[in-house]
Amino acid sequence: MVTTRSSARRTPSAELPLLDGHASGNGHANGNGHANGYTSVNGTSKKRHSNTNGVNGRDDEHDSKRQKVAEPVDRTRWRMKADDGRHTWHYLDDKEAAEKWPQSYADKWYMGLPLNLPALDPPKAPSDAVRNGLTFFEHLQLPTGHWGCEYGGPTFLLPGYAITWYATKQHIPEIYKKEIKNYLFARAHPEDGGWGLHIEGESTVLGTSLNYIALRIMGVEPDHPVMTKARATLHKLGGATHAPHWAKFWMAVLGVCKYDIVNPAPPELWLLPDWVPIHPWRWWVHIRQVFLSMSYITSKRWSCEEDDLIRSLRNEVFVEPWESIDWNGNRNSICEKDNYHPKTWLLSTANWVLATIWNPYLRPNYIKNKAEACVSNLIDMEMANTDFACLAPVNQPMSLVCCYIRDGPDSYTVRRLRERMEDGIFVNADGMMVCGTNGVQSWDTAFAIQAVVSSGLANDPRWRPMMEKALEFLDNQQIREDVKDMDKCYRHPRKGAWAFSTKVQGYAVSDCVSEALKSVILLQKEASGYPQRLDDRRIFDAVDTLLTYQDPKTGGCASYERPRGGQWMEMLNAAEIFGNIMVEYLYPECTTAAVTTLKLFQKHWPDYRAKEVSTFIERAVRWIKTAQYDHGGWYGSWAICFTYATMFGLESLATIGETYENSESARRGCEFLVSKQREDGGWSEHYQSCEEMRYVEHPSGSQVVMTAWALIGLMLAKYPDVERLRRGVAFIAGRQQPDGEWKQEAVEGVFNKSCCIGYPNYKFTFTIKALGMFAQRYPDVKL
């Protein structure tokens, strides 16, 4: 039998924090394998999804083939604490503690537990379905005014946490082990037992190798049926030598493979003058921050202490004997299923020079030390500017490893990062996973406000308390100052802005600024009686920052920053699993968000920077038209895909008065959408649209979220065929449950062209908005 790392290596100071109410205090299990005081129940819970592949489950045929639960867990004991937008999860082993802190509706919903809400009156008109939907959605609002969700989908995040915990000798509580096992067992591919890049993807070496290792860290033995099946798939795909760069990096940190198999990530690039075209400051912020920490670790060539588990893994994840592997010869080995963006000749040449000449023979120690010091300083600035939350749960565990190497296991930086890593964890009906960011708090709250306003209900006393709490949350989450020394750490201005999640995370995004500001203006200026929480100066701060996002060459908007480098930089894309990650790109979604918000702002403050605002709108819409595809649609980069972006493209045109009747661009956009409407009235698009850049129907049929996007775009463009719209509205209303809920369907979001990610609240915010808009425009039309 393979042994796991002994608990003697895990000091109490390294325990995972924030497990309030865990009876044993340190998370160790008692003699029967259960945490002290734990009462097990049947962990198989009712699924909250329809018969489609989705964030919360696969279809019924596949569902019967899935491992339901690795170890039973009493899901009534989980609580999510929302503290000023920060989400942390707590398992209350003690009965008295659980009674003092009862589960909220949101907790139960996340867990897939029954809410036992009463059935509402069946809707006769779209407005009835709107109210029913809001009645359910209101139950999910958290005390701080926002909505939480599992922002999950990518499969490489959880292994990064697991490997970091293990490599840095951090105690992993038993309840974490159980729930991680449960989640990964549930998410194994129903046919071959592997894991993909994301939860709906086919098995890859990246997903299978890393999640196999994560399960071994959690104590699953190699002869477990789930592991033997996954290992067989991994070997069929070529074994861990054929993993992409990021997986090889994590396996080198763990000591499962040697660093010679990891292509270089030279920290010396940070020493280049800023004017050099390939300097990392020009890269897209996510790849920049990942490279930052990765370059420090690979430069140190640090691996954790070897033990029995690591030695065993060396014999499990490779096809050939570990001792005979040509590590350097396999630097570029990669499974075809992982190789979405093959390395270019330029990158391969650079890697060869760095790996075979520069690093072993020419690299002076003083350059190495200087580069590591530069990177180390930038990591410190990242932690200071985010209170250790970091940009995302991708670079955060890497930063922890950096600090563990540099500062030692008991340092403040290591302890604080361990605490902050809790922010990325989410627990759902399947178990414990890691989100793509520390949440979607500000983003989802803005769309919730817009859904109510678009439905004409902002002034309805029934919904005012919900909206006032949402407004208060956006008030609290506005970022009030720029980053200290932002030029030195290459950060974009952010004063007055909003982040995707929370102000503590602090990375402003153009569309997050736009949608939050729009929502504030809608309630404070368009509706009546709402508190004026943001005064004019704070509104102006947001506009000032928003205006900095326009690309001076084209007029479009990117995401975190203006483009700093050209698309040719993709020749240096070393990730292999993603496309379009090296630099910022211009997006119809981000550009539209800015256009619509500035147009609304202009209505209420016509004199503030009037010429600049007008010029921004004019140039942005001009770019939107150039981004339209020949078939009439727009390509979406942040959700799936043409349906999503075409909604935004039509919204941009409508903002300047261009609609189906008077605009060729709007008419083509509408015709593209209606050409994709299905017989049942809905729309359906598969994530392969993002990968292949062509419209691909979802095999499971129509989806409520995509139907809502299509309807919103068509109504904004004043598409004249009301019957087509009515059929789409009837489809959405027909999927609504008696208590007002919509069940989870297929995954909604995407990033970097190839990786899906879930936005579970979209099935409320966009469906309610579509139904509400229809009810406002056609009040006499029934379902």
Model-identified regions with their sequence ranges:
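Preference for long, amphipathic alpha-helical scaffolds in soluble/luminal domains
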Residues: 2-783
